[in-house]
Amino acid sequence: MSRGEPGSWGPVVETGRSRRLLRRLAVLAGVGGLLTLAAVGTTTQLLVERAETNLTRVPVPELEQVAERSDARYFLLVGSDTREGLDEDDRRELTLGSFDGQRSDVVMYLAISEDREQVSLVSFPRDLLVEVDGRTQKLTDAYAGGPDQLIRVLRDNFQLPVNHFAAVSLGGFVDVVRTLGTVEICLEEPLRDRKSGADFEAGCHDMSATEVLSFVRSRQGDRADLERIDRQQTFLRAVLGDLTATRTLANPRQVYRLTEDVATGLTLDDRLATPQMLGLADELRSVVSAGMPMTAVPAHPRRIDGLDFMVPYGPGARALFDDLRSGQHLAERGTREERDETVVGVASVGAGAGIVDSTLRFAGFQTRVGARVGPTDELGAVTTVFVVPGEEERAGWVAATLGAPSLPLPDEVAVPDGVHVIVASGDDATT
């Protein structure tokens, strides 16, 4: 699907029929919700039995075996836009078109370190460029071959191991929102999107399930799918915050309903037993409650053979995946609002200035091309972040996004007005 076309989630009116249809749509959070329920101390036999009754399990042969209980764990989380079970009226109501297969509408990667001290969530753009059997393809289309093909794609393209698979129905998650009542989402600016149905003023909103749906569907903004990823992660943080709040989980009846809501929309691989999953979550209690680092794969747009792709930014993506595999804490990359208020001056030293500029803009930073860093004899090969005095934190966000080293700004370099960070683009940006 090219940018600008209607997404697979059309405007929804919350009628009885729409509630039934919502169960067939997909977004990610059910695993996080179920893990969080367990992590706050609800790992009772009743919870296990209720979850197991409502879960769906499938075999996924491509998964890597976990040798020891204490090993690191890597989950592939998918929301699918499959039309299975939808009649023509359903498709028209939800603006789904005539596509009969399935694609991954949301792809996230959850990494849990061996020492259980780090839990990180990374979103993949739907239009991310990947190779499938020697052919160029969008990541969203790779799921047409099922979970095994998507796992192979992540392994072959990014060397990411996958131990467990989960597909999550939006219906179950919308039921979680209904059980919670509302979810508070705060917006820095108005959001109006005819395609998703979003219509919000700037400020904080107690969103209903229908309003949340319009919010997380929206691709409104210059960064298209990366805008939607930001909104999905904002939603996840808000819901996980509500789930870990004492007021939410103090009511046993509410806990019971939440467990049923999450599990009903959840499909898991058949290797992850419910007691094992809840036991893992119990080990992560303090980490989940403290907040889960979330980010997206750094990428830049490119048009290839008439199709719009997001191409992974090589150095930044490789550094991110290395951290996930090794269980390292993900470096801070700033909030969406903080990145939007950070201006990066891009100095063209190597061959990758345009790619660096585009990657930073799609990550949410403001950029100015044409900054100067003085003599470049030792630069050109490796993209380097220069730290403006007093802007160390912002420089860290940029360095983490680009997977780049940082150096103090040379005394002789003048900082343009309004610029917070300077980046000297290198040839490595093209790899």
Predicted region positions:
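Non-catalytic, solvent-exposed segments at the cell envelope interface
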Residues: 2-431
